[in-house]
Structures are given as structure tokens and as C-alpha cells.
């Protein structure tokens, strides 16, 4: 009986769509634990964290996530990247919900894990209050929020541009016909790319550049006690890190494929 159950489980786990779902789930979980943990250090730890540390946390979190699942699903860990690959015909649309569901669940669980790990520090920092805005806010550990110097639509354009740069450079790093990263170094190079985007272009919006990075942790804070303000803050900013990266990644992909990839002669020609 036990053997039969194990065989059934093994049979299910060998299905391609199941393996891809689990790969996106686990790789996104790894990315987000490192990323959110680094933000928690910056927000809660006074001198124990820094903005550079946040960029390193997310950058090398991406690297580790690709090592975890790159050979199975490609380790997108980003609904905007998945959307772009589907929209540009590089993967089937039927994979889109499988990938995104895995990413969202992994990100949500990572937010819950971060909350449990830093529960004491979060409560101590704000005197037991769960604040979305203000100098003692802690919701920004989990999701991005629009700063005072930015308007909603400037933030939208910012997210479109930065995500476009992300997707353009990912295509360049992985383009075997151009000048790709050395074999085996792609995870490191993409991680460095994320870090560079953060230190050069991340100030305005916190460079969400990923619906899977922003929306699930935001929803976690909503149900964990921060309340409805996580969606209403910043003139209802919440939808921008969901929609703008989809548009930005698509445009960045088109720019690279149209201006660079299409002009590369086939190998052997």
C-alpha cells in the first residue's frame, strides 16, 4: 500500500507541469527570503543593514533561485518575465498560469517566513503597531510604496523603464547568437544585473520590477494585520508594480529582439 502511494506521488512529480510549478515555487521562495530578509535588516536593524545590502540580497537571491530551478523551468521568478516569454512566442501560454501560481505562492510563503523570523523585531520597532506609512512603518519590508517625491504616473513610467532594462539585459545575457555570459555564469550575471538596477535606478520606486515580488507579500501584510492601507497608500499604488512591469518587460524584450537579435546572422552563415 505504502509503495503504491509512493509510486503515485513519484508519477505525479514527474509530470512536466508539476515540476515546473514546483521549480517556480521554490526558486521564488529562495529569492524572496533573501530579498525580504535584507530589507528587514535595513528597516529594523539600524546599522545592521543598508540599501546596498538590499540590492545584494535581491541580486544574489536571484542567483540562488536560478541555481535551484534554472534547469527545470528557467527560474523566471517574475510574472513579467513569464508574460514576456509567452507574448513573444518563446513559451506556450498554457504555462503562464502554472508559472505565475508557483511564483505567487512561493513569494507569499517567503513573506510569511520573513514575518515569523523577524516577528519580535517588527513589534519592537514600532511599539507593537503594524504601520504602513510614517517613520516607523514596517509594511515596506514586504512590498514597495511610493515615496513623497514621486507621483503615481511618474512611478508607473519608472517601473516600465527599469523592468524594460531588466528584460532587455536578460535576453542579452542568454542570447547564444550574440555575446552571452560564459556557460554556467548566467545565474551570477543575472544576479549582478538585478543588483546594478537597484543601485543605479532603484531609488524612485524601490524597483519592484516584478509582480510576483510585490503583490503576494502585500496581500500577506493585508491579512497579517497591516490592513487595507497596504492597497490604498500612495494613491492606490499597489497596482502599478503589477501592471507596469508587464508592459516594461514586454517592451524591453521587443527592443532587444527587434534591434539586436534580429540583426545577428545565423551561426555558420
Swiss-Prot record:
The chain crosses the membrane at residues 21-38, 52-69, 96-116, 152-172, 185-201, 238-259. It comes from the Eukaryota. Phosphorylation by PKA could prevent the interaction with PLIN1. InterPro entries: Aquaporin-like, MIP, MIP/Aquaporin. The modification Phosphoserine is found at residue 4. Residues 39-51, 117-151, 202-205, 220-237 are extracellular. A motif (NPA 2) lies at residues 210-212. Its main location: membrane. Detected in heart, kidney and testis. Keywords: Cell membrane, Cytoplasmic vesicle, Lipid droplet, Membrane, Phosphoprotein, Repeat, Transmembrane, Transmembrane helix, Transport. It is found in: Cell membrane; Cytoplasmic vesicle membrane; Lipid droplet. One of its GO terms (cellular component) is basolateral plasma membrane. A motif (NPA 1) lies at residues 78-80. Pfam families: MIP. Homotetramer; each monomer provides an independent glycerol/water pore. Two homotetramers on opposing membranes can dimerize, forming a cell-cell junction. Interacts with PLIN1. This is Aquaporin-7. The lineage of its organism: Eukaryota, Metazoa, Chordata, Craniata, Vertebrata. The gene is Aqp7.
